[in-house]
Structure formats: C-alpha cells, structure tokens
Curated annotation (Swiss-Prot):
Name of this protein: Syndecan-2
Function: Cell surface proteoglycan which regulates dendritic arbor morphogenesis.
SMART domains linked to this entry: 4.1m
Entry PTM: O-glycosylated; contains both heparan sulfate and chondroitin sulfate.
Membrane topology: Single-pass type I membrane protein
Subunit structure: Interacts (via cytoplasmic domain) with SARM1. Forms a complex with SDCBP and PDCD6IP.
Gene behind the chain: Sdc2
Originating species: Mus musculus (Mouse)
Distribution of this protein across tissues and organs: Preferential expression in cells of mesenchymal origin.
UniProt xrefs under InterPro entries: Neurexin-like, Syndecan, Syndecan/Neurexin_dom, Syndecan_CS
PANTHER family: SYNDECAN (PTHR10915), SYNDECAN-2 (PTHR10915:SF6)
GO molecular function (one): identical protein binding
Residue intervals on the Extracellular side: 19-145
Domain of life assignment: Eukaryota
Length: 202
C-alpha cells in the first residue's frame, strides 16, 4: 500500500512538472530561424542619435554655472535613558554641479573666500554645535560583537578539549583493564599441561 501511495505521488509530480514546462516554452523559443527580421535574434532597433553625434561634437554640451552649497550638521536631541546612549546626527548635503569648462585658480580662490565670509556672518551658531558621532574603534577586539564571538568560540573550544581528554582517559582505562593484576586469581598450573615429550618410533 505504501508503494502505491509513493508511485501515485511521483506520478502527480511528473504530470504537474510537465504541464509547467509546456506553459513556459513557446514556438518562438524552439526555432532559431524566425519568419521576420524584427523577431530574429541579434537584431536591435536602430538608434539615430548614435549616428548623428560623435564624441566632442559640442552641439549638446550645456555650460552650467557652479552652484555653491554648504553642509550643516543638525544634531538630534539624545534620549536620557541609559538604554540608548547613542546620538544620531543628520547631515544635510547638496551636490554641486561643476561646469564643463575649467576655471582659473584665481576664480576658485575668490569663491572659497566668499564661502568663508558667509560662514563668519552666520556667527558662532554653526561653530558651537557639538556633534556626537559613534566612533568605530580601530582595534578589532574592542568591538562588542567581535569580543562576544571570540568568547563564545573560546568556551566551545574549551568544552570540546575537556570532552576529548575525558574520552582519551576512558579509552586508556578500558584498554589497560586486562594488563594489570586486579586481585584476580591466576589459573592453576594444572590447567595447562605439557604434552608428553616421549617420542615413539616405529
């Protein structure tokens, strides 16, 4: 009866897998030569933009002026509970768009001076903000997750070593049981009799 159920289950699985395979395949997948060029493999649509433009043509290049951006750190208020001593900070950053043409070093120096003057005008509000960030220590063993993994590995290794030593001691005792005199009586000499040494010749 059990074999009948196993054969029935295998037959059903074969039917279901055969149906899914026929649904996934189509006539286009079976034949390599298709009737039209659009359906043939290796034919891609023609992109006219690739033929009309070349590298360095300069027709579509947009000259953008640089956008000055500043980044300001906004600290979040930390929770007072001992469960979460970490303070999360959020940094606002915007990306600057660089122009296609290079600028002279004098112009970039002027822009840096303008930025520093703008920061000074904002006053000590920006300078006095204390930002607390979580610093990952450079030493590998000062991290808590690494330290926990090392301790767990050491405990498991120590237990394995103790188990191995106990197994060796048990095997040694079992092996040595027959080699020492444990107070058992030795068989008497009458149990082992010598064969007669006389020889008879015919």
């Amino acid at each position: 009866m059990q074999r009948a159920w196993i054969l029935l289950t295998l037959g059903l699985m074969a039917c279901v897998s055969a149906e899914t395979r026929t649904e996934l395949t189509s006539d286009k997948d079976m034949y390599l030569d298709n009737s039209s060029i659009e359906e043939a493999s290796g034919v891609y649509p023609i992109d006219d933009d690739d033929y009309s433009s070349a590298s360095g043509s300069g027709a579509d290049e947009d000259i953008e002026s640089p956008v000055l951006t500043t980044s300001q750190l906004i600290p979040r208020i930390p929770l007072t509970s001992a469960a979460s001593p970490k303070v999360e900070t959020m940094t606002l950053k915007t990306q600057s768009i660089t122009p296609a043409q290079t600028e002279s070093p004098e112009e970039t120096d002027k822009e840096e001076v303008d930025i520093s003057e703008a920061e000074e005008k904002l006053g000590p509000a920006i300078k006095s903000t204390d930002v607390y960030t979580e610093k990952h220590s450079d030493n590998l063993f000062k991290r808590t997750e690494v330290l926990a993994a090392v301790i767990a590995g050491g405990v498991i290794g120590f237990l394995f070593a103790i188990f191995l030593i106990l197994l060796l001691v048990y095997r040694m005792r079992k092996k040595d049981e027959g080699s020492y005199d444990l107070g058992e009586r030795k068989p008497s000499s009458a149990a082992y009799q010598k064969a007669p040494t006389k020889e008879f010749y015919a």
